[in-house]
């Protein structure tokens, strides 16, 4: 269990138990730079959302690995030296089709920020799609993994140059039909 300043919870028997020996690598879900550095200090992998641009990616990758080298006190069986980013992946035959789909993906981000940021949701009353359609919310991150095969390939090469260890793709985001 845990008894802390801000919250407490009773001990639980977590099932299923990992059968792998040693224990599988540990990861921390990270939403900002400080949580990425916390993962490095704990000697575990950092799983984050996409960054704003490749320069920021490079800075965060370098900060993670520098902190890992200098300060890591592993909490697991071994160090998991990986920074991974979650990104949307939608491959389209043309730039115009990608732009049309990209707007629908932005709705997913708008919804995410609504529920975990600024929103005041009222079930049965709040229409996120209507609110999004009327909003002037600005999306400041790169969407290079939404586009033509050439654009996506170029984006992945930039992530590679920035030193990113892994990228995890999500294809089910936004107001997109199964056929799309």
Outline where the language-model segments fall.
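Glycine-rich, proline-tolerant flexible connector loops at the mouths of alpha/beta enzymes
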Residues: 51-54, 170-180
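Hydrophobic faces of well-ordered beta-strands that scaffold small-molecule active sites
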Residues: 26-29, 44-49, 81-88, 167-169
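A conserved active-site cap/scaffold subdomain adjacent to cofactor or substrate pockets
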Residues: 32-61
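Short catalytic/ligand-binding loop motif for oxyanion handling, primarily in non-cytosolic enzymes
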Residues: 35-36, 57, 93, 175-178
